[in-house]
């Protein structure tokens, strides 16, 4: 926003005095920074008042969804998600950056290949999506260590505090990632409009300064020093007011908070507990940050699912379309202006990046599934709300009132919250007073309008609010100069075209609705039956009532066409911005929104653009689909769908119609059980001939871990030796006295971890894991040992990831992995000399392409056999379906031809493991570099996505697996197969294979 010179002089004068600047433009209070350099940049690009953000001087509501690039590291597929978000009517995506993936070794920042953020930013720009950058350094995110690299366990200072050792440890990462973000912020023509320093900085232990203004200011200064000039926003984990503007040092520019009102009990997806619907957020906002727009930086879009949980299908049921209607519209009642849903797309926890309490899938029950499908009804419901927000600018300038059970509705069973506008229209959010009610309630409304106070319906009958539903009724809604005095049906969108205006309204099945329009024109039904439609003309308006039908009706009132739809029909409509200069829709601006067209096209419409006399649509189809286009510019004569010229007809209302045929491809998937499987023992460490001379010695007398002191003669904490991820192996050498009868050990691997112990080649036993246990103390009986003879104890520990660091001062991220105690407890027992290993090289990890977390310490991993084309020619022939006959770990490999048609079909293939004979396994698909943990006694997910972008997708695929048998009887997979969902004819285009180097003999591998 540009200021007059007089205003600028006043600002500079106040700035010189160190004051915060406030001024009024067009009746709104704007807040400017006291820092002149920052203010100079922001005044043109991103500013705000107490109502909303302004981008380039234009008021805008930020409607956003969370999506993490590291959970879908394929550029073209990132564009796919951005386009699906754009199609919702959203204009923004929020993203985390996982520090652990880009600085696996202190001082070495590597953000290339799949970890390069710039293609992610470019894809956002191509889709016309703004970005909210959230690089941490702490992110939580159900990620290992909350995004902290494992080497922070050695930092001599409290994490997320002003301790110098911790701050110094963050400098390299933040300076690099913030500089990249600065390069792509809006001031440089990029998509990034907001920056969040820290994450959920909300709770601290007693004895620790919290909140620490010095710490928070340091994190903010790190970003500013790297060139970040866009506004800083925070996300208090609850509406507590921490670091809000005006709180002093460490205050952010815009205060935001999180909210997950239904919690995470997916096991009871139909239960909405009493009292969980927020009702005081507006009051808290006015108390905590009245000068900034109301922001919820994380509002519940799904749920995580723990080991043994009911699965993400249940989570998507708990947080379904009904939840969205009730809870998201409730947020609108608070005049939310920055709303980000966590998650919009969850993705996958590739290669050990997840935290201990979760598994491979991070589907999150979100609107877009892990396999990138948009078949959940909650996606379509979001589209209705997102598009309504785009065409309701008066919402942002209205004045929210208090909720009430009297004054608007004629029954106390309903609660109404008004947002009253002057000349910009008003909004009335209606819900059940018992928000979880599944009853249908009949009601009438009395609403203030420009035509006076009106009792609705005027033409007789009643309105209906069905169970677990909510509505936003509008009054004096401006449809490009036509005043909608009121509408009880909800607004999907409206547009002004050269030949008139179009308004799209929808209602639920079985409902009756009514609207009134300021006009002297008559009502004409121009499509569909007149049955169930009534109207009445007054001196200055016309009132229309109708019963919702599954068949579309169109009525004409003057130059306004009104489409009357049921909700399920409205799901099939899309409102793409119409590009006239190139193919990209561009960012959402009032001009771009106004230029949109309306398309009925089923599964997905990605983009629309004009080129010469052609109207080009890019769209996805999962069935033969009738396509209709409303508002085609007069310059367009031909229709192209996905690049193909498509014949079309034009009806009397100017609607273009065409049909896209869908022919399901003939897909023949190979039978995995019939492949020529090769096997290699991946636990050679228990063989008598095994040489561990190259292993690091666990000989540190002290630990650098400040959370837990040593209870062993030397440190057996893996992070002290640079091993932070995946399987850990220990070999303890001792010379027997002959008195030893038992071996006691306490292993730590995180929630649901497992461990196994051998003496030489003799299996002693295993801990198969429980969700509630992150460590386990076991005592194993020993056979009679021969005095003077050397023995080796081999311990395998499944490291499930590092703990998150939610509460400042607890330093739970430093919870060690490995062995906390071990001994031969008998009186004259010999001491044990330990060696250990994790991934080859530890922090000097071997595979720079796949990153520092991808590999663990199993023999096959250290050798690189999990990579494509391992040297399996001379391996034993054996299948994971045959498995192991005794406790151990095997690695299985097979190749096959995957011949998929290259006709634009997206197949969303998956690997499905349906059952296990024995309790635990791990498997790895080398083509996707996914590590999955499947535990029989707390198994939740048994399907793994195979996204496009995998190398050699249409030629040789390689599947590798490490079944871990924690039972003396061995173990095997009961079933292993490839499957696919309904193929989608997609306009996404070619997906380039990400770099996946093949096997190469590793120097120094042991």
From Swiss-Prot:
PROSITE patterns: GLYCOSYL_HYDROL_F35. Keywords: Glycoprotein, Glycosidase, Hydrolase, Pharmaceutical, Signal. GO terms for molecular function: beta-galactosidase activity. The active site is at residues 200, 298. Pfam families: BetaGal_ABD2, BetaGal_dom2, BetaGal_dom3, Glyco_hydro_35. Residues 1-19 form the signal peptide. Its EC number is 3.2.1.23. It comes from the Eukaryota. The keyword Nucleotide-binding does not apply. Glycans are attached at residues 156, 373, 402, 422, 478, 522, 622, 739, 760, 777, 805. Belongs to the glycosyl hydrolase 35 family. Cleaves beta-linked terminal galactosyl residues from gangliosides, glycoproteins, and glycosaminoglycans. This is Beta-galactosidase. It comes from Aspergillus niger.
